[in-house]
Protein backbone atom coordinates (compact mmCIF):
# COMPACT_ATOMS: atom_id res chain seq x y z
CA UNK A 1 0.00 0.00 0.00
CA UNK A 2 1.37 3.38 -1.03
CA UNK A 3 0.89 6.66 0.82
CA UNK A 4 -2.11 8.81 -0.18
CA UNK A 5 -1.58 10.63 -3.46
CA UNK A 6 1.21 8.33 -4.68
CA UNK A 7 0.72 6.82 -8.11
CA UNK A 8 0.63 3.04 -8.33
CA UNK A 9 -0.96 0.06 -10.03
CA UNK A 10 -4.58 -0.77 -9.17
CA UNK A 11 -4.84 -4.30 -7.71
CA UNK A 12 -8.06 -5.95 -6.50
CA UNK A 13 -7.92 -8.47 -3.65
CA UNK A 14 -10.79 -10.52 -2.27
CA UNK A 15 -10.69 -10.41 1.52
CA UNK A 16 -14.26 -11.35 2.38
CA UNK A 17 -14.34 -15.06 1.48
CA UNK A 18 -13.41 -17.43 4.28
CA UNK A 19 -11.47 -20.62 3.54
CA UNK A 20 -10.62 -19.28 0.08
CA UNK A 21 -7.18 -18.44 -1.21
CA UNK A 22 -6.30 -14.79 -1.50
CA UNK A 23 -6.48 -13.95 -5.18
CA UNK A 24 -5.06 -10.69 -6.45
CA UNK A 25 -6.07 -9.31 -9.80
CA UNK A 26 -3.62 -6.89 -11.43
CA UNK A 27 -5.39 -4.43 -13.72
CA UNK A 28 -2.18 -2.79 -14.99
CA UNK A 29 -4.04 0.53 -14.65
CA UNK A 30 -2.14 3.35 -12.93
CA UNK A 31 -4.03 5.57 -10.51
CA UNK A 32 -3.77 7.01 -7.00
CA UNK A 33 -5.86 7.02 -3.84
CA UNK A 34 -7.25 10.42 -2.96
CA UNK A 35 -7.05 11.83 0.56
CA UNK A 36 -9.58 10.26 2.95
CA UNK A 37 -12.90 12.02 3.56
CA UNK A 38 -15.76 11.42 5.97
CA UNK A 39 -17.18 8.76 3.63
CA UNK A 40 -16.74 5.11 4.51
CA UNK A 41 -15.11 4.18 1.18
CA UNK A 42 -11.88 5.51 -0.28
CA UNK A 43 -11.94 7.53 -3.46
CA UNK A 44 -9.62 6.84 -6.35
CA UNK A 45 -8.23 9.31 -8.90
CA UNK A 46 -8.76 8.85 -12.61
CA UNK A 47 -6.75 6.25 -14.50
CA UNK A 48 -3.62 8.00 -15.76
CA UNK A 49 -2.13 5.19 -17.83
CA UNK A 50 -1.20 1.55 -17.97
CA UNK A 51 1.89 0.03 -16.46
CA UNK A 52 2.46 -2.14 -19.54
CA UNK A 53 2.34 0.89 -21.89
CA UNK A 54 4.98 2.85 -20.02
CA UNK A 55 8.24 3.74 -21.76
CA UNK A 56 11.30 5.27 -20.15
CA UNK A 57 12.69 8.12 -22.24
CA UNK A 58 15.70 10.00 -20.87
CA UNK A 59 14.81 8.82 -17.38
CA UNK A 60 11.18 10.00 -17.59
CA UNK A 61 8.23 7.59 -17.43
CA UNK A 62 6.15 8.35 -20.53
CA UNK A 63 2.73 6.93 -21.38
CA UNK A 64 1.29 7.18 -24.91
CA UNK A 65 -2.00 8.35 -23.37
CA UNK A 66 -0.23 11.51 -22.14
CA UNK A 67 0.74 12.38 -25.72
CA UNK A 68 -2.77 11.51 -26.93
CA UNK A 69 -4.38 13.93 -24.45
CA UNK A 70 -2.15 16.75 -25.68
CA UNK A 71 -2.85 16.03 -29.36
CA UNK A 72 -6.60 15.81 -28.71
CA UNK A 73 -6.53 19.18 -26.92
CA UNK A 74 -5.67 20.95 -30.19
CA UNK A 75 -8.77 21.50 -32.34
CA UNK A 76 -6.69 21.61 -35.54
CA UNK A 77 -5.55 18.00 -35.10
CA UNK A 78 -7.30 14.65 -35.27
CA UNK A 79 -6.62 12.25 -32.43
CA UNK A 80 -4.24 10.23 -34.59
CA UNK A 81 -0.57 10.48 -33.71
CA UNK A 82 2.57 8.39 -33.78
CA UNK A 83 5.65 8.43 -31.57
CA UNK A 84 8.90 7.51 -33.30
CA UNK A 85 11.52 6.75 -30.66
CA UNK A 86 15.16 6.26 -31.60
CA UNK A 87 18.57 6.53 -29.99
CA UNK A 88 21.05 9.16 -31.14
CA UNK A 89 24.36 8.26 -29.52
CA UNK A 90 23.49 7.78 -25.85
CA UNK A 91 20.30 9.88 -25.87
CA UNK A 92 16.77 8.82 -26.74
CA UNK A 93 15.01 11.06 -29.26
CA UNK A 94 11.27 11.28 -29.84
CA UNK A 95 9.50 12.58 -32.91
CA UNK A 96 5.71 12.93 -32.71
CA UNK A 97 3.72 12.82 -35.95
CA UNK A 98 0.26 14.44 -35.85
CA UNK A 99 -2.49 14.68 -38.45
CA UNK A 100 -4.54 17.76 -39.37
CA UNK A 101 -8.34 17.80 -39.35
CA UNK A 102 -9.76 17.36 -42.90
CA UNK A 103 -11.03 20.97 -43.01
CA UNK A 104 -7.46 22.18 -42.29
CA UNK A 105 -5.97 20.42 -45.36
CA UNK A 106 -3.50 22.57 -47.26
CA UNK A 107 -2.53 24.63 -44.23
CA UNK A 108 0.66 26.64 -44.80
CA UNK A 109 4.05 25.85 -43.31
CA UNK A 110 3.84 28.78 -40.87
CA UNK A 111 0.54 27.59 -39.39
CA UNK A 112 1.79 23.99 -39.23
CA UNK A 113 4.88 25.26 -37.44
CA UNK A 114 2.72 27.07 -34.87
CA UNK A 115 0.68 23.92 -34.21
CA UNK A 116 3.84 21.80 -33.95
CA UNK A 117 5.41 24.31 -31.54
CA UNK A 118 2.25 24.32 -29.39
CA UNK A 119 2.26 20.50 -29.16
CA UNK A 120 6.01 20.47 -28.50
CA UNK A 121 5.73 22.99 -25.65
CA UNK A 122 2.79 21.16 -24.07
CA UNK A 123 4.68 17.86 -24.13
CA UNK A 124 7.72 19.53 -22.56
CA UNK A 125 5.58 21.15 -19.84
CA UNK A 126 3.19 18.30 -19.02
CA UNK A 127 5.28 15.19 -19.75
CA UNK A 128 8.78 16.52 -19.15
CA UNK A 129 10.55 15.44 -22.34
CA UNK A 130 11.77 17.35 -25.39
CA UNK A 131 10.39 16.16 -28.71
CA UNK A 132 10.32 17.08 -32.36
CA UNK A 133 6.79 17.41 -33.76
CA UNK A 134 5.71 17.12 -37.40
CA UNK A 135 2.21 17.97 -38.62
CA UNK A 136 0.90 16.07 -41.65
CA UNK A 137 -2.12 16.39 -43.96
CA UNK A 138 -5.25 14.36 -43.16
CA UNK A 139 -5.14 10.61 -43.90
CA UNK A 140 -1.33 10.58 -44.04
CA UNK A 141 -0.68 8.47 -40.95
CA UNK A 142 -0.82 4.80 -41.89
CA UNK A 143 -3.71 2.83 -40.42
CA UNK A 144 -4.26 -0.88 -39.89
CA UNK A 145 -7.10 -2.81 -41.54
CA UNK A 146 -9.31 -1.96 -38.56
CA UNK A 147 -8.74 1.77 -39.13
CA UNK A 148 -6.51 2.30 -36.12
CA UNK A 149 -3.03 3.78 -36.27
CA UNK A 150 -0.04 2.14 -34.64
CA UNK A 151 0.92 4.60 -31.92
CA UNK A 152 4.51 3.79 -30.98
CA UNK A 153 7.48 2.90 -33.18
CA UNK A 154 10.35 2.17 -30.80
CA UNK A 155 13.51 1.84 -32.91
CA UNK A 156 15.96 1.83 -30.00
CA UNK A 157 18.36 -1.11 -29.85
CA UNK A 158 17.38 -3.64 -27.19
Regions found by a protein language model. Give the residues of each.
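Active-site glycine/GP-rich loop and adjacent strand/helix microenvironment
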Residues: 1-158
Amino acid sequence: MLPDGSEGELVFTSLSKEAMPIVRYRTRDLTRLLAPTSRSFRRMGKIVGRSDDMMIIRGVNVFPTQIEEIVLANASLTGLYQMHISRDGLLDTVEVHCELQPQRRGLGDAERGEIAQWVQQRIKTLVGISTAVRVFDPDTIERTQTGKARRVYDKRPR
